[in-house]
Amino acid sequence: MTAPAVEAARAVDWADFAPLHPLAGSDWQVWGVGLLRNAGFPVSGLDLIGGTSAPAAAARLAAGEGTAEEFDTAYRADVDAEAARLAALATDPKLRLAIAWQNRTVFRILDSLAAPGGKETKRRQRERTLAMYWLRYCAKAETIGFFGPGAWIGVGRTQEAIGIDHGPALVAAARTSLERWTVAAIADWMAEQPGARWWFPPMLRPDVHLDGEQLVLANRKTVRLRPEDAQVLRLADGDRNAEQITDLLIADHGWDAAGARGAVDKVLNRLLRQRVLGWDANIPVDVRAEEVLRRRVSAIGDPEMFVRYDAVLAELARHKGEIDRAGSAEQLVEALDALDAYFVETTGQAASREEGKAYAGRTLVYQDTLRDCRMELGRDFLDGIARPLALVADAADWFGNRLAELVETEVVALVRKAAARQRPGTAVTLADVWPQTLALFWGEHNHPVQQAVRELALKWREVIGEVPDGATRVDLSVDQIIDSAKKVFATGEVRSPHLAVHSPDLQVVARSVDAVNGGQHLVVLGELHACLATLDLPFLDWTADTGSLRDKVNRAIGGERLVPLLPVGWKRNSGRMVPAPIGAGDRLIGFTRAPFDQRERIEPAVAITLTEHDGTITATTTDGRTRTLSELLAVLISIIACDAFKIGLDRPHAPRVTLDDLVLFRETWRLPATGVALAPKADRMRDYLTVRRWVADNALPDRAFVKFPEETKPSLVDFTSPTLVLSFANLVRRAVQSDPDARVTVSEPLPAPEESWLPDADGEQYVSELRLQISRKVPE
């Protein structure tokens, strides 16, 4: 059953959301609040996928010890057994509920899988789809719905490594929300109805600067304004509707009440034709979308229109209530379908979008949940990884500084070129170099981040030292490499306070909580997100006491940021997920059309001046505040640095690298896709034999995480499973067809399923991950 949307349990003290606890023997501090992420289904579910007879039969055949008939028999037996398990799985109520939330198209094939018969090729395809969903739900620690509930944890407050208490259920609290694009579509429909736009907010474009009684456009052209135009624009803040603007002009600026409404309408339409103004629902791309729409409707002064639109909001709320009350997958699908039908009937738009894209917010609603547990990560745990984690954090500081330095060098050159084109005495603005600056991060040519990554790889190679060919494990101690690491990763002060927070994702290799507390465990550094506070998760703001998580980060760091106001179509900019959450004190860089409901917080790029003195560029905003280039571009640098920072050895086969009790890098293979040597035409049994031979030749584990070039994240593949080997073979063929030089990245599954320590109240164990934040100090 979907849990009701309730207030989150106070499991942590939010006053501890700051760097509080020293990593022993270093000047790094761990923040006092972390996040436990986990799978929503027990890890034991992985045992439902896989072959028992075919792998051995394939090995015997490859060694010349078995026959094709023996393999054929074993393979068909495994296919039938796995198909039977998948058919039974298709009836599992909890799995059906998870899939109903995520993909109703897949949900609708589950009954046909559970029933016998049907066309074999279609049935096998559906089995592959279900198997891939199941492995994801059992093997990946996520933060989405009840199939990935998170839990806030206390960090460093207790001595024992891990203390955990469970409630009776997996999920303690849930919240269902409309996707931002859903809200925007409803709001746009409202604003487009006859006579409605008057009750919605006009806003001066983010990339246009109002300077007295003239506008400065992004291309530096100026538009002289009539006095009344300037007065209207100063009030067009993206939140006031035209009626509210009119009232202020009458009350504060002496406009004649009799003709003010017509005059304001005339001004707004004139500015709209000049394309310096937006006049629509203006729903920002963040988790406040529903709140903003409610505010829009509440401000409508036309009684008939207000009642009509208020009824729409009430109907949306009713549909959300039905979704929350759904007690089964079938009831959930019925409720979701009803919401879809209402949305289509109301807006005339499709009820889904961006099919197949990750982080896109494809359907109308989403649900976030909290796990029903309370957990403390104690000092014994932190002390065990303090020295190696501090060494990695030193490397992250170096990487952030080096990336910022490379970006600054490029931007200085851009500013100088722009200055040479200007008339004497004319300052360069950020708008003059903004397109080229963005290209430094996401353009087609050689980016600064690519150079920084290459240099980082060389530095890790120098620190780790020579690794013999064929080695599968490299075990190092901090004492062995600390002098080299301090020299190699030496760097100055971090160039911006907002590049000074690093976020490790840790996985614990242990069979139980008792094993962890007894010191019988290993810790894996899954990733370290450099220069980024990854606990800044807007979709969990509802769980975090008062205020947003971004506000808490800014308070702890002691400063606000300049955040680029990204347009709606920007990658991963869906509302629930955003590249750069915006805090209450942050100011925004306006560089294109983009919705936001507080125009006074936007700094148009054309109004930010860039001046050079003694080789240093200083950015000055309209309030007179100055910033270095790294401070100006800190958010962009952070977005890129967080995924670019890597540890390990760039070689076809890289061994597992362990530093004291912290695994820095899992054993990894980067293999040419053509090396699988599949025949051009698919054949299930032949493909299985070919893949099993490839696994054996490269000494790969039977279960491994696999990533193809076009994929965002790796997926678990069981190379004993007839179902998943067939999927893998299809992906290999597709990759080779797209790029003959494509490589497949394979990494060991660490922790192994039996080493998943996180239990529930029933004793089942779950894949999990601990997300922490560390910083050297609170920057001044």
Question: For the regions a protein language model found, what residue spans apply to each?
Answer:
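C-terminal structured domains
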Residues: 508-779
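Hydrophobic residues embedded in beta-strands of well-ordered beta-sheets
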Residues: 215, 284, 615-619
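Type-3 copper protein
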Residues: 1-169, 262-560, 759-780
